[in-house]
Amino acid sequence: MRNSIPYELSVKLGDANIHPELEVQSGSEAAHAFAIDVIYTTDAGTRCALQKAWALAEHLGAQVRLIFLYAVPFSLPLTAPAVSLPFLKQKLAGLAGSFPGEVSVRIYLCREPIRALRDLLPESSLVVLGGGKRWWPTRAQRLETRLKKLGHPVIFAETR
């Protein structure tokens, strides 16, 4: 996956401190049981999506994975984003900190987010997105449409 560099870490929800369990720069994926993928859209949308995913995960015995895609401009090296990784980690820890249980947080530095999602999501992955709905498609709604075209079942958690 030359389009992106993954940075993986595990965050115990309910604990705003983020502790990197694993930071990798390879495409290796640990084998896990059934997982629900939450893709970051906005703070409010992601918070809503995490609530929905956590409710589903409790009933299904699934792991919740929060995926944050950061598009690095072509003018910068992929290994040197404009935003620091510690800042992104703290931001995601703050989002995840209000939920019980555990979530796996993955930060991907990429050039093209949709291409990175196509490469990293296993076939038919259950995806939860959050965001507002309007009569014109929002960014989150367009992402929902693209993921459905790639064959992923998508649950849209609407913010109010």
Predicted segments, located by residue:
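Structural beta-alpha unit
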Residues: 1-30, 99-127, 134, 143-154
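Small/aliphatic-rich secondary-structure junction motif
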Residues: 27-79, 150, 159
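Glycine-rich, N-terminal phosphate-binding loop of Rossmann-like dinucleotide-binding domains
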Residues: 40, 131-132
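A conditional alpha-helix N-cap/helix-loop micro-motif detector
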Residues: 46, 85, 107-110
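Short beta-strands and strand-loop turn motifs
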Residues: 68, 127-131, 158
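Acidic, Ser/Thr-rich peripheral helices and adjacent loops at domain boundaries
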Residues: 79-93
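Membrane-proximal amphipathic alpha-helices
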Residues: 138-139
